[in-house]
Amino acid sequence: GGYETTSDEAKANMFEFKDSLISDWTIYAIAGALGNIANESAFNPWRWQSDTVNYNAGYGLVQFTPASGYINEFTNYANLSTSEITAGARPEDGACQCDVLRNDSMGKWTDRSSYNLWYDLSSFESFSAFKSVNNLYDATMAFLYNYEGNAVVLSRDEARQRADFAIRYASASTCYEIITGEPPGPGPVPSRTIENNLMKKYLKYGFFF
């Protein structure tokens, strides 16, 4: 299982995550990713998707999928447990996951702005743009769509997308306050619309898709 956001275990892992990435990511990028992590692994770097060992499903802080891609390529750890720290699930694995995330070593970042029917994410086509993001709203949204790319994102169901994002943004706001000691502020007014997004794509590609 995972940890409650305000638990000592979750807080300790948040600070480890921040300390690992702060030299390369803005504090907003870090908190935005943490808001998503809260709803993926609940801050447990050794967690398997559905708490069941399955090398074809998700594993780790951000639920690397398939798990075999992360475990076989970036670690030598085997027999990872879903219930306790084993010889293969040690703190070094959590640090390794941060290193993999630092520059998206697994190549998971994908421009999915066309899946968002209500907010323009075209400024975050690249992972480098995400790492330098300057507000929590965009950070949480960009990580959800372009890194996580979960089933809700792929559904193109606006109501579900908005509800899922609201949960993750609330988590990100809590994480930001924990790791900085202050609230994130109101952030940008989400005035960028799908109409603007589609027009940009039309001007760029000459067609809608």
Predicted segments — roles?
Residues 189-209:
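Enriched but not universal
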Residues 1-24, 38-135:
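Peptidoglycan-targeting cell-wall enzymes and recognition modules
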Residues 128-189:
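Active-site or metal-binding loop neighborhoods of secreted/extracellular toxin and effector enzymes
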Residues 25-31, 85, 184-185:
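Short, surface-exposed acidic
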Residues 123, 172, 195-196:
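Short amphipathic alpha-helical segments that mediate assembly, nucleic-acid/protein binding
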Residues 30, 95, 137, 166, ...:
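A generic "functional-site adjacency" signal
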Residues 27-35, 134-141:
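Alpha-helical scaffolds flanking conserved acidic
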